[in-house]
Design a protein with these regions (language model features):
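Rossmann-fold NAD(P)-binding glycine/threonine-rich loop
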Residues: 80-102, 120-121
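Short strand-turn motif at the edge of the Rossmann-like AdoMet-binding core
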Residues: 78-82, 108-110
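C-terminal hydrophobic helical "lid"/dimerization subdomain
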Residues: 63-66, 113-172
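Short beta-strand/turn micro-motifs composed of small residues
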Residues: 12, 79, 168
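Helix-to-beta-strand junctions that scaffold the AdoMet/dcAdoMet cofactor pocket
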Residues: 69-71
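Short glycine-centered segments of the SAM/dcSAM-binding site in methyltransferase folds
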Residues: 73-74, 104
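Adenosine-nucleotide cofactor-binding segment
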Residues: 2-64
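Short, conserved catalytic or adaptor-binding loops enriched in Gly and charged residues
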Residues: 22-25, 94-101, 125-135
């Protein structure tokens, strides 16, 4: 979204500073911790949110986002959640806010070939605009496909990993 000139605010659980918050800062994005600021407080502090792209995997956040969304705003839900989380929500306030505020909520999955190509193009642009930044995302290298157990361990347990990747073949 920074590549498209948008102001970006990332809202996540972990308190900064840490690697992700620093990387976002390098792009000119703001990082806010849910441990320090509610989404509603962030909306008041930085102005109403025109677009919220929810990808946390924490379903209650979708309803908080619905309340924090500004007039004429769009809430995009992109995470598939499992489990049976239950929260109490003020459905009348959310409904009224969406109707009178002309808000939109949509769900999306970006799984087509065109989405993949668009993603690759954005990665190329990101490298041009922010040289070297993408390599900082590649935090955990796994050598060979036969080390899938190690890859899964990092994906599940390594809280410092941003992107775990498999080096399929050595160059040469």
């Amino acid at each position: 979204m920074r590549l498209r000139g948008l102001e970006v605010i990332c809202y996540s659980r972990r308190v900064p500073p840490y690697r992700n918050s620093e990387l976002l800062g390098e792009l000119g994005a703001r990082y806010i911790s849910s441990q320090q600021t509610t989404l509603t407080e962030a909306s008041k502090q930085f102005g109403p949110f025109d677009l919220i792209f929810e990808a946390s995997g924490f379903s209650p956040l979708a309803f908080q986002a619905a309340e924090a969304l500004g007039k004429n705003g769009v809430l995009v839900l992109s995470s598939v959640t499992g489990g049976e989380k239950k929260v109490e929500v003020n459905t009348d306030r959310i409904n009224q806010g969406f109707v009178l505020g002309n808000k939109v909520m949509v769900g999306t999955v970006n799984a087509s070939r065109a989405d993949f190509i668009s993603g690759v193009n954005d990665l190329v642009k990101a490298e041009a605009f922010y040289p070297g930044w993408l390599n900082k995302l590649l935090t955990t290298r796994i050598d060979g496909l036969d080390n899938y157990a190690e890859m899964l361990r990092h994906l599940i347990e390594d809280k410092e990993a941003i992107k775990v990747y498999v080096e399929v073949a050595q160059e040469g």
